[in-house]
Amino acid sequence: MNVQIEESWKQHLAPEFEKDYFIKLTEFVRSEYQTTTIYPPGRFIFIAFNLCPFDKVKVVIIGQDPYHGPGQAHGLCFSVNDGVPFPPSLQNIFKEIQSDLGAPIPTSGNLTRWANQGVLLLNATLTVRAHQAGSHQRRGWEEFTDAAIRILAEQRENIVFILWGSYAQKKGAFIDRNKHLVLASAHPSPLSAYNGFFGNKHFSRTNEYLQAHGQTPIEW
């Protein structure tokens, strides 16, 4: 199957594209886009991979689902398009960056600038029906994104994996802590941010680790 995804990822994920689950997933997603409103727009489904080639990945942040409101989702977890008000979790992420690094709250919630520096902003599920949170879960996306994380963790070294909340922590449970830095805390959602997200210093800790391993820090 010829999947429109960045070439280095295409090579590493090629076996997945031929598996039954992925063929069924593709048929389901194609049908959904033809019959109802799906986010993100189709050209952005694999944008997290397209902006962040396999060998350029320094950091992985794992999300769960794309935003399901109009104009929000554009294929990067937690990120929104320019001009879109910050969802609560993203607002809290920026507050923690401000507290941790002294950086001002940005004017845009578009995290493409992170992706361009090597931050893979990966949702576990890459599509969703408008206004129906979780509507494309358990259709095969989770298996596909598990494979992407597993291949990265096995074939690369010294990546920072950031796991916020129990869902992301379960998804990243197999990552070898001897080869990579795994940072885990509560989710930035208002429901849990005060239970361990605020004050986690994940952004400064990420940069310290990258610099200790000869890499350029991220401009958060």
Question: Could you tell me what each predicted segment is?
Answer:
Residues M1-L13:
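Generic N-terminal amphipathic, Lys/Arg-enriched alpha-helix
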Residues V3, P15-V160, A168-K170, I175, ...:
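A polyanion-binding, active-site-adjacent surface
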Residues F197:
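C-terminal substrate-binding/active-site "lid" region of AdoMet-derived donor-dependent transferases
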